[in-house]
């Protein structure tokens, strides 16, 4: 991984040590090149790259699709429950190092079922790792994402296959999402499967307004009726939409280094996060696919603080937003925010 490094300022150091939540992380996107090669060897999978360095050199993306092509190739090494456990535990270690005390994690079952790996195998491995993480003080939820470049019929079949798992793991597997290639695949394409998930009382999220237009965010809100919008950075192009997001407190799970790496913005100083924050939108900072985009949660905070010249109060608000927007009980939310406040305002609020 080519890590984005910024010399920590006192605010960055305070942020690094602060308890945080991550709300936009694709577990398959945390698969580092070293682990890809280790799993390939363990499982006898032939990779298109002859070395870790050659694979890392291929991480030169021009847009979302060029990233997705290599992302799916990397996931090909995941075959057995232990593989999903190992991948998830590696992410957990990164969270613990970054003081991420709560994470809501996406996984893409269709990436695996099309290779003959049952959803139950995927979830069992991830769940076992997340149960171990809880013993170390990190809580988590799991969100099943549909691949939007595939058909809604495929998504509906995936949802039906996963129904027993939503019951078996109801403490953890609490929602559905929508990811993969955004262009040409509007949220409206998945209205039926989201209605089924909503009828079960599941939480709903969707990627919208990363490469897609503001109209995709409206569709996510009005047709899918999402609880959170993933990315959403192009909402700034529609003032009425920004006002609606701010008034409704529907959070945006923003991923700054991902946006930079995928050329959503050609420079982090041009990122819309601060403008959205200034207008009252509940923005959060997340890593997306950290193994591919050069940074886990703290690296995203450091780069964003530096590029957008965020101040103490703004960073506190962003971190607090991550807890406010999380899918936990009100009691858990209060506990999480209390931990943040104890760190951020050790002598009490000013």
UniProtKB/Swiss-Prot annotation:
It is an enzyme of class 3 (hydrolase). The record marks 231 as: Important for catalytic activity. One of its GO terms (molecular function) is zinc ion binding. Binds 1 zinc ion per subunit. It catalyses: adenine + H2O + H(+) = hypoxanthine + NH4(+). The keyword Metal-binding applies. InterPro entries: A_deaminase_dom, ADE, Ado/ade_deaminase, Metal_Hydrolase. It holds the Pfam family A_deaminase. It comes from the Bacteria. Substrate binds at residue 289. Zn(2+) binds at residues 24, 26, 207, 288. GO terms for cellular component: cytosol. Keywords: Hydrolase, Metal-binding, Nucleotide metabolism, Zinc. Its EC number is 3.5.4.2. Its cofactor is Zn(2+). Belongs to the metallo-dependent hydrolases superfamily. Adenosine and AMP deaminases family. Adenine deaminase type 2 subfamily. Catalyzes the hydrolytic deamination of adenine to hypoxanthine. Plays an important role in the purine salvage pathway and in nitrogen catabolism. This is Adenine deaminase. It comes from Paraburkholderia phytofirmans (strain DSM 17436 / LMG 22146 / PsJN) (Burkholderia phytofirmans).
């Amino acid at each position: 991984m080519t890590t984005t490094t910024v010399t920590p300022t006192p605010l960055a150091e305070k942020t690094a040590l602060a308890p945080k939540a991550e709300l936009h992380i694709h577990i398959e996107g945390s698969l580092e090149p070293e682990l890809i090669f280790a799993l390939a060897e363990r499982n006898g999978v032939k990779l298109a790259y002859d070395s870790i360095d050659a694979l890392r050199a291929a991480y030169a993306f021009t847009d979302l699709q060029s990233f997705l092509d290599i992302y799916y190739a990397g996931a090909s090494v995941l075959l057995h429950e232990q593989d999903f456990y190992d991948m998830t535990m590696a992410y957990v270690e990164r969270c613990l190092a970054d003081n991420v005390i709560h994470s809501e994690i996406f996984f893409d079952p269709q990436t695996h079922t099309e290779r003959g790996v049952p959803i139950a195998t995927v979830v069992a491995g991830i769940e076992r790792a997340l149960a171990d993480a809880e013993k170390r003080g990190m809580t988590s939820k799991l969100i099943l994402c549909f691949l939007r470049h595939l058909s809604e019929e495929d998504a509906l079949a995936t949802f039906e296959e996963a129904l027993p798992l939503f019951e078996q793991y109801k403490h953890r597997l609490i929602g559905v999402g929508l990811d993969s290639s955004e262009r040409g695949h509007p949220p409206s394409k998945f209205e039926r499967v989201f209605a089924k998930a909503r009828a079960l009382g599941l939480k709903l999220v969707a990627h919208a307004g990363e490469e897609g237009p503001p109209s995709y965010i409206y569709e996510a809100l009005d047709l899918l009726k999402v609880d959170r919008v993933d990315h959403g950075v192009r909402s700034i192009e529609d003032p009425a939409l920004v006002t609606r997001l701010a008034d409704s407190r529907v959070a945006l799970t923003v991923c700054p280094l991902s946006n930079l790496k995928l050329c959503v913005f050609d420079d982090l100083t041009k990122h819309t996060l601060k403008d959205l924050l200034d207008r009252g939108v509940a923005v959060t900072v997340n890593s997306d696919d950290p193994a591919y985009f050069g940074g886990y949660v703290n690296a995203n905070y450091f780069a964003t603080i530096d590029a957008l010249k965020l101040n103490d109060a703004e960073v506190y608000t962003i971190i607090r937003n991550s807890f406010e927007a999380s899918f936990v009980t009100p009691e858990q939310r209060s506990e999480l925010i209390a931990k943040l406040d104890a760190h951020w305002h050790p002598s009490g609020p000013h």
